[in-house]
Design a protein with these regions (language model features):
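A charged alpha-helical hairpin associated with nucleic-acid processing machineries
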Residues: 31-40, 67-83, 87-237
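Phosphate-handling DNA/RNA-contact segment within nucleic-acid enzymes
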Residues: 1-79, 96-97
């Protein structure tokens, strides 16, 4: 906020020529670096992108004052198989991360990796790198929370999993997220892990969510006894 009480940055409105939901700041310039580093770092603000490019992270992009959309995710996954979202650790950052999770889950596939990095509340990416160094920031990126771990965090937030009510509330929160996903192996694994965490069987949880888990194929062997023909002995197959 400036001295006059005005915001430092003003978000421009959507127009037919400028759609924030279809635009990522710095993506064109970052394409080569994204391929070289094999991941893209998505920041909350375009000034983070400018600063990070100067500090050794030219593979950073940013949304333009709007929540992450499905179109943003499609654009990112066309460039790389690994996406890392960086958010502030405050409540606003948590809300933005949850919206990104909701945008990502319907577009997940088993060959893609999406992670969520939450910085301390007193830092943004620029200040974190300046305080702890580029190596520490890179380490934090590589150790960022997986999309499945963040899913469990969102679904169980504020719920006591030691109580039936808490487990039921967690199932209620998880259901629309699981239903939004395509029928991939990751969804099956997430559902089974959620069943373990909530003391539920996978069959009970999939019935609640209206999902079908394909069971592993079982191979059976049968023994057939052939009737002996004239002059022949019984044969067993």
């Amino acid at each position: 906020i400036l001295d006059q009480g005005e915001p430092k940055y003003l978000n421009s409105p959507e127009t037919p020529l400028f759609s924030k939901g279809n635009t990522l700041y710095g993506l064109f310039e970052a394409r080569q670096a994204i391929r070289a580093k094999e991941y893209v770092l998505v920041c909350e603000g375009y000034m983070d992108v400018v600063a990070l490019a100067q500090l050794g992270f030219p593979n950073a992009v940013a949304t333009l004052g709007t929540a992450c959309t499905a179109n943003h995710v499609r654009m990112l996954l066309r460039q790389t198989d690994k996406v890392v979202f960086s958010f502030d650790g405050d409540s606003a950052g948590q809300r933005a991360a949850q919206r990104a999770l909701e945008a990502c889950l319907p577009l997940m596939s088993d060959d893609k990796e999406i992670r969520f990095l939450f910085l301390p509340t007193e830092h943004d990416p620029d200040s974190y790198v300046r305080a702890y160094g580029a190596a520490a920031f890179e380490k934090a990126i590589q150790e960022a929370m997986s999309i499945s771990s963040f899913f469990f965090k969102v679904a169980s937030e504020g719920h006591d999993l030691t109580t039936p009510e808490g487990r039921a509330h967690t199932h209620h929160a998880a259901k629309p997220l699981l239903l939004s996903m395509p029928p991939i192996a990751l969804r099956t694994q997430m559902l089974r892990e959620l069943a373990i965490r909530t003391n539920t069987t996978p069959a009970e949880l999939e019935a609640f969510c209206g999902l079908t888990i394909v069971p592993a194929p079982q191979v059976t062997y049968q023994t057939k006894v052939l009737k002996p023909q004239s002059g022949a002995n019984a044969q067993t197959v």
